[in-house]
Amino acid sequence: SEEVLQPVDHEYYVMQSEFYHEPPETDDNGRPSRQLEFSYPNGLSEEPQLVVFNGREGALTTAHPLKAKTGETVRVFFGNAGPNLTSSFHVIGSCFRKAYRDGDVLSPPGRFISTVSVPPGSATIVEMRMVVPGTYTLVDHAIFRLDKGAVGFLNVSGKPRPDIYGSAAPPSPCVGCKLHA
């Protein structure tokens, strides 16, 4: 039998979800509790306190980024657990050579797509060929969700490709920025 999806070098699973909670309680020493209480009013008004990838803020950033090498193909199975917000999944610095919207692997994929809309309870499958080394940033392109935790990194190693991309200034971190490693 013929495989529906062709083999790739790396496959990753990324799930976006949002959390609605009350402000954390504090203990006698003024430290906030790590246990949060669900907020029905915040959920009803669709105002999440957190929008995250893989269950928590920072799950796919500096400590646990996705990884690949130049010349490799990466497939991301991206889901949106919701419960309320539609995700505009985007990888800064790349485009999706193939995008299987709604996880539909029987229809031809979209080609060279920049951003994929994923409603709550749905999924998509995207593929990227990594050409230039660097840190690629996974975001919900409703960009202010970045400050609520919807950010991850794909670190690509390999030989520089100044014929494709170069910068006069060396990379340097932005103070307080969540967009870069």
Question: Predicted regions span which residues?
Answer:
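Copper-binding active sites and cupredoxin-like electron-transfer domains
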Residues: 1-181
